[in-house]
C-alpha cells in the first residue's frame, strides 16, 4: 500500500494522472478484489443500516457483500485511518500517511480542486540581489528549474490599496535545511465578498538577506508599496545561532526603503520611542492560532490554493505524540503551509482593498502591527 504524500511515489502517481510522464495510472480498490466480501442474509435490512461512508462505497462501485465485509473488517482496526490506508477505496486513502493529521482529508481534497499549473516558471531579479537597488529594473526570466511560480500576473490597470499580501517563511541555505517560501496573495475579490487567492510563490534555498529582499522584490513587482504588505516570519531569524544573527539589521534596512512592512510592535508604543519589531513571530501562542484559522479556512473554502505541493504539506502536517505540538511528519516540510496559515490569517484581519482613484502623494511611514490588526 502506498503511504504518504509529497514523496517520490506520490509525485510520480500525480504526474501519471495528469499525463506528464509515460506511466499509466492504475488503482485497484479493495472492493475490486473478490475475496473481500461476505454473504448477507437480509439485503433490505442491511441497506437501511448503511452509514454515509458505506453509501459512498456503493457509489464507488462496491457491492453490498463487499461493504458487509468492510464493516466487519473495520472492527479489527484500531483506527479508521488505518483501515482506509490498508484497504483504500480511493487513491487519496492509499496515500494517507497518519492518523494524527491536523487537517481533515475531505478538506484538503476540496483545497486541491483549485490547484492548477503555473503560467510562468522561472526567476525574478533586479539590478542587485540586495538593497534598494534590488527593487530597480525588476524582470522575469524563464527557467525550468527556477524557484518562482506565477499563476496570475500583476494587474496594474488600476491601483487598489491593501490588495496584495506577501508572506515569507524563512528557511536555510543548505540542501538539508528547510526551504524559504514566499507566497503572494491577491485580495481583489474580497472587495465584493469574495476570497483571496494564491497568485505566486518563490520556493527554494537562499541566504536570509537575499531572501528578505526577494520578498520585497515580489511585492514591488505586484504593486506599489502602499498596495502590498510584506510579512516576514521572524521566529527562525530570532532564534537561530548562525545564519539569523544579523537579520534584525536587515529588516531595519528594508523598513527604511519599504514602508508597508508588517510590525508586531503596537503603533502607539513606537510613537513613544519603543523599537519596532518587524515580522510575524511564530511561537507556542501564535502558531496554534494561525493553524486553527487555516483549518477553518480550508473547511469553509475561505481562500483559493493553486499549488499542489502546498496541499501535500497540509496532508503531512500532524499533531505530535505529546498531543500539543504540531509539525510536518518526519522527512517532510511545512514552509508552504506556514506562509498560507499566516497569510490567510492576515488576509481576514486587515482592511478590505479599495480602489485608489487619484494620485497618492509620497507615503509616510505606516506601521502595520498586531495591535492595528
Residue ranges of predicted features:
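RNase H-like, metal-dependent nuclease domains and their acidic two-metal-ion catalytic environment used
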Residues: 1-9, 18-22, 38-40, 44-266, ...
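Active-site-adjacent substrate-recognition loops and nearby beta-strands
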Residues: 12
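Conserved AAA+ ATPase "SRH/arginine-finger" region at the nucleotide-binding site
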Residues: 26-32
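Surface-exposed intrinsically disordered loops and tails
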Residues: 269-276
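Amphipathic alpha-helical blocks and their helix-capping loop/short-beta junctions
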Residues: 277-284
Amino acid at each position: 500500500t502506498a503511504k504518504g504524500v509529497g514523496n517520490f511515489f506520490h509525485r510520480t502517481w500525480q504526474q501519471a494522472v495528469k499525463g506528464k510522464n509515460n506511466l499509466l495510472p492504475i488503482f485497484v480498490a479493495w472492493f475490486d478484489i473478490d475475496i473481500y466480501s461476505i454473504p448477507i442474509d437480509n439485503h433490505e435490512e442491511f441497506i437501511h443500516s448503511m452509514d454515509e461512508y458505506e453509501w459512498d462505497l456503493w457509489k464507488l462501485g462496491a457491492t453490498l457483500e463487499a461493504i458487509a465485509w468492510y464493516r466487519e473488517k473495520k472492527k479489527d482496526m484500531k483506527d479508521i485511518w488505518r483501515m482506509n490506508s490498508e484497504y483504500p477505496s480511493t487513491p487519496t486513502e492509499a496515500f494517507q500517511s497518519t492518523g494524527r493529521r491536523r487537517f481533515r482529508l475531505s478538506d484538503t481534497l476540496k483545497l486541491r480542486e483549485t490547484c492548477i499549473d503555473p503560467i510562468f516558471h522561472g526567476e525574478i531579479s533586479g539590478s542587485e540581489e540586495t538593497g534598494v537597488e534590488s527593487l530597480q529594473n525588476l524582470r522575469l526570466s524563464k527557467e525550468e528549474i527556477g524557484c518562482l511560480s506565477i499563476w496570475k500576473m500583476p494587474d496594474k490597470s488600476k491601483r487598489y490599496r491593501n490588495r496584495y499580501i506577501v508572506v515569507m517563511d524563512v528557511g536555510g541555505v543548505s540542501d538539508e535545511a528547510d526551504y524559504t517560501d514566499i507566497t503572494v496573495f491577491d485580495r481583489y475579490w474580497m472587495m465584493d465578498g469574495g476570497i483571496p487567492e494564491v497568485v505566486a510563490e518563490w520556493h527554494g534555498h537562499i541566504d536570509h538577506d537575499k531572501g528578505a529582499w526577494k520578498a520585497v522584490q515580489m511585492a514591488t513587482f505586484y504593486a506599489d508599496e502602499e498596495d502590498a504588505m510584506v510579512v516576514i516570519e521572524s521566529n527562525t531569524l530570532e532564534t537561530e545561532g548562525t545564519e539569523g544573527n544579523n537579520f534584525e539589521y536587515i529588516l531595519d534596512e528594508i523598513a527604511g526603503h519599504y514602508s508597508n512592512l508588517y510590525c508586531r510592535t503596537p503603533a502607539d508604543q513606537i510613537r513613544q520611542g519603543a523599537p519596532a519589531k518587524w515580522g510575524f513571530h511564530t511561537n507556542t501562542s501564535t502558531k496554534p492560532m494561525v493553524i486553527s484559522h487555516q483549518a477553518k479556512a480550508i473547511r469553509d473554502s475561505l481562500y483559493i490554493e493553486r499549488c499542489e505541493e502546498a496541499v501535500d504539506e497540509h496532508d503531512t502536517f500532524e499533531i505530535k505524540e505529546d498531543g500539543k505540538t504540531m509539525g510536518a511528519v518526519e522527512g517532510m516540510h511545512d514552509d508552504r503551509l506556514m506562509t498560507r496559515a499566516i497569510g490567510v490569517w492576515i488576509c481576514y484581519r486587515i482592511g478590505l482593498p479599495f480602489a485608489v482613484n487619484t494620485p497618492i502623494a509620497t507615503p509616510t511611514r505606516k506601521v502595520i502591527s498586531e495591535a492595528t490588526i
